[in-house]
């Protein structure tokens, strides 16, 4: 193995790239900050220390996330912990819920699921986990807020297994809850980690007592220990044993209990992500699978963020490095346009703060300045024609028809929507029967962002109105004659999206079911690949 390949393999083995997913208010933002605190990226709560020694307040990026048009961003943070480079991708809350959230999950190798132990599994968690399941992404689970009155722990595990359809292996177990929360018992190390409230508590302050039968524990809290021993006996008999193999296959989730606001349980999660979560894996491309330890650079764009810096009205394409070594100034081939670009101003992130990248390896997320030529799903390489797959469009859940007040601006509207559709800001459907263009989204905020960007970037004042569409499905058929017949017969429901793919716009659930039954040769798709055009 050459020195370069040996170094690439070494760097890749020390990369961990994961997303944090949760329902809003489960404590995700707090946990994100605490992970940064434990890693040393934050020197004190509220102040993030950049790699060059510069500081900025974490409240800066939290405030930015609240602003419209910027809150659609998913924060990307890179930090070092235990000789590993960790790439953490945060996902936005439900007001900002968009396809952007889904696509972030295509760029990671594992996910950390945060659940409010008082509420259990909630709607957005279900949606996000379903997306993780598309790629069998390994999931680590953190039951948060154990210092409050929470639900029964066994009940929570049961709910995760039944609702999310993933088996649980408890790694730590809570001792008491709310005002009587005493800490957690580690099933793997047979140790009790004592809890003491306080947002400034660090690892050095946390006391660990070895052995569940240690007499000191009975002296400290006899009632809770009696209850704990009964529960642990039950848990060992009723729950799944920890298996790294099943975790990596996405079939089993290790479960940790704690309180992020009190820094409790955070160290255990970070260690689990380093010890158990996978390093960057092979990625599927149209021509072959790509090994992260290959010599040549490759990667794909999973997100485009406009106006990250409101002062510069810029656009950044977020690229997940899939193989090789990226070096500043290198030439990269933009495969869709068959064009080379010189990568000199590529950046890395600490949330919205950035610095120029000198080098990057598989698993790293880098930002390429984009002047409108880069689309979501675009692949880059050192020359080889390989387009990465697994970057999906999702069937929209909300629809609006769009028209303009000034008919003279029609061309600008069409151009704007075409570009925004390609960028992935919204899905654009052109009905075959004529009439207004239809926009599709999975979150209301997407429409608001599109309206403001049409006005700011294209000078178009657009009117959005509700459309009588329940859902959209892309469709395909191996038999061209049957495909043409379907399109001709149901012309009133057929549209073409920004990528030139055919879609069926269903007015209601019954209509879609009946259509599927009547046309058994037509295959309906809830997702479609960026890199693959249907019916070609």
From Swiss-Prot:
HAMAP family for the chain: Rel_fac_3
Recorded superkingdom: Bacteria
Keyword Cytoplasm listed: yes
Classification via Pfam families: EF-G_D2 (PF22042), GTP_EFTU (PF00009), RF3_C (PF16658)
Compartments where found: Cytoplasm
Entry keywords, A to Z: Cytoplasm, GTP-binding, Nucleotide-binding, Protein biosynthesis
Protein name: Peptide chain release factor 3
Gene this chain is encoded by: prfC
Family: Belongs to the TRAFAC class translation factor GTPase superfamily. Classic translation factor GTPase family. PrfC subfamily.
Principal location: cytoplasm
Molecular function GO terms recorded: GTP binding; GTPase activity; translation release factor activity, codon nonspecific; translation release factor activity, codon specific
Gene3D superfamilies, A to Z: P-loop containing nucleotide triphosphate hydrolases (3.40.50.300), Peptide chain release factor 3, domain III (3.30.70.3280)
Binding site for GTP: 22-29, 90-94, 144-147
InterPro entries: EF-G-like_DII (IPR053905), EFG_III/V (IPR035647), G_TR_CS (IPR031157), P-loop_NTPase (IPR027417), PrfC (IPR004548), RF3_C (IPR032090), RF3_dom_3_sf (IPR038467), RF3_GTP-bd (IPR041732)
Domain tr-type G: 13-281
Lineage of origin: Bacteria, Pseudomonadati, Pseudomonadota, Betaproteobacteria, Neisseriales
GO cellular component: cytosol
Reported function: Increases the formation of ribosomal termination complexes and stimulates activities of RF-1 and RF-2. It binds guanine nucleotides and has strong preference for UGA stop codons. It may interact directly with the ribosome. The stimulation of RF-1 and RF-2 is significantly reduced by GTP and GDP, but not by GMP.
GO biological processes: regulation of translational termination
């Amino acid at each position: 193995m050459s020195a370069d390949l040996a170094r690439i393999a070494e760097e890749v083995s020390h990369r961990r790239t994961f997303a944090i997913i949760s329902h809003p208010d489960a404590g995700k933002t707090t946990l994100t900050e605490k992970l940064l605190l434990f890693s040393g990226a934050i020197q004190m709560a509220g102040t993030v220390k950049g790699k060059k020694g510069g500081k900025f307040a974490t409240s800066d990026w939290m405030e930015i996330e609240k602003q419209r048009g910027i809150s659609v961003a998913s924060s990307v943070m890179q930090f070092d912990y235990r000789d590993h480079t960790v790439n953490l991708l945060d996902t936005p809350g439900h007001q900002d819920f968009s396809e952007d959230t889904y696509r972030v999950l295509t760029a990671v190798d594992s996910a950390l699921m945060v659940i409010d132990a008082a509420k259990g599994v909630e709607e957005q968690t279900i949606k996000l986990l379903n997306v993780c399941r598309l790629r069998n992404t390994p999931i680590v689970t953190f039951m948060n807020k154990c210092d409050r009155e929470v639900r029964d722990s066994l009940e929570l595990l049961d709910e995760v297994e039944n609702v999310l359809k993933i088996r649980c292996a408890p790694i730590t177990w809570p001792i008491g809850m709310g005002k009587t929360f005493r800490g957690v018992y580690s099933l793997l190390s047979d140790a009790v980690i004592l809890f003491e409230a306080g947002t400034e508590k660090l690892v050095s302050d946390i006391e660990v007592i070895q052995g569940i039968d240690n007499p000191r524990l009975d002296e400290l809290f006899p009632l809770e220990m009696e209850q704990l021993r009964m529960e642990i006996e039950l848990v060992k008999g009723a729950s799944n044993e920890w298996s790294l193999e099943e975790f990596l296959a996405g079939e089993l989730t290790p479960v940790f209990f704690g309180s992020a606001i009190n820094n409790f349980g955070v160290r255990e999660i970070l260690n689990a992500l380093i010890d158990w979560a996978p390093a960057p894996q092979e990625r599927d491309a149209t021509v072959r699978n790509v090994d992260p330890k290959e010599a040549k650079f490759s990667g794909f764009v999973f997100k485009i963020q406009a106006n990250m810096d409101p002062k510069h009205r810029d656009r950044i394409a977020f690229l997940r490095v899939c193989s090789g070594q990226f070096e500043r100034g290198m030439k990269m081939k933009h495969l869709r346009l068959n064009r080379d670009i010189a990568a000199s101003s590529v950046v890395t992130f600490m949330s919205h703060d950035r610095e120029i990248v000198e080098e990057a390896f598989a698993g790293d997320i880098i930002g390429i300045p984009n002047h409108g030529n880069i689309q979501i799903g675009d692949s880059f390489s050192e020359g080889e024609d390989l387009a990465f797959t697994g970057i999906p469009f999702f069937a929209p859940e909300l629809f609006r028809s769009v028209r303009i007040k000034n008919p003279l601006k029609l061309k600008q509207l069409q151009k704007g929507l075409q570009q925004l559709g390609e960028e992935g800001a919204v899905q654009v459907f052109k009905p075959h029967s004529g009439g207004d263009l239809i926009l599709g989204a999975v979150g209301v905020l997407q429409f608001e962002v599109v309206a403001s960007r049409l006005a700011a970037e294209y000078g178009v004042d657009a009117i959005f109105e509700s459309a009588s569409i329940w859902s959209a499905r892309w469709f395909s058929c191996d038999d061209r004659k049957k495909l043409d017949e379907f399109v001709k017969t149901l012309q009133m429901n057929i549209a073409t999206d920004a990528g030139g793919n055919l879609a069926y716009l269903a007015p209601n659930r019954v209509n879609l079911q009946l259509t599927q039954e009547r046309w058994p040769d037509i295959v309906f798709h809830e997702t479609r690949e960026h890199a693959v055009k249907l019916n070609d």
